[in-house]
Amino acid sequence: MDSRKKKIFLKAKIASLIAIAAPLLMWVFLLGHIPIIYKNLNLSETSWGIFLLIFGSSQILSGQIFARLITPKYGTKLMICMGVLILSISFLGIIVVNSYESFLFIAVFFGISLGLIMPSTNSHITLIEEKTNEVLQP
């Protein structure tokens, strides 16, 4: 592989890793805010479980829909940008949430945003791994 292609794949690798790291960092910050959210909304552990159920369901469904129907039409770059935008807005919403219903409603958007980001970045990483023979994702 020539140096020009190596530079392209290096830039693609960095972009994909940033696109994966940003949501994970936001998730860690959300976990740090759980005690504050519990106190403000007077929640129980079951409430957190319902949040995770809604979040996971919307992530799986949106990931399948976007990966199969919308991403091939509009491209991965747009999907990642839209996902990060929705993720940022929903993250801010989770921090300032003031009711249990809105807390659960934001879980849907949190899941949709990761459903936009993860399939696109995973396809990029798979392509990079094929071309460079590096293992980026265990």
Q: Which stretches of residues belong to each language-model region?
A:
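Structural signature of the two symmetry-related core transmembrane helices
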Residues: L78-L92
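Intracellular juxtamembrane helix-capping segments at the cytosolic ends
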Residues: L116-E130
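Juxtamembrane helix-start elements in MFS-like secondary transporters
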Residues: I34, Y38, L43-L52, L136-Q137
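Residue-level signature of mid-helix packing/kink "hotspots" within the transmembrane helices
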Residues: V28, G56-Q64
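Helix-breaking motifs and short loop linkers at transmembrane-helix boundaries and internal kinks
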Residues: N42, V96-E101
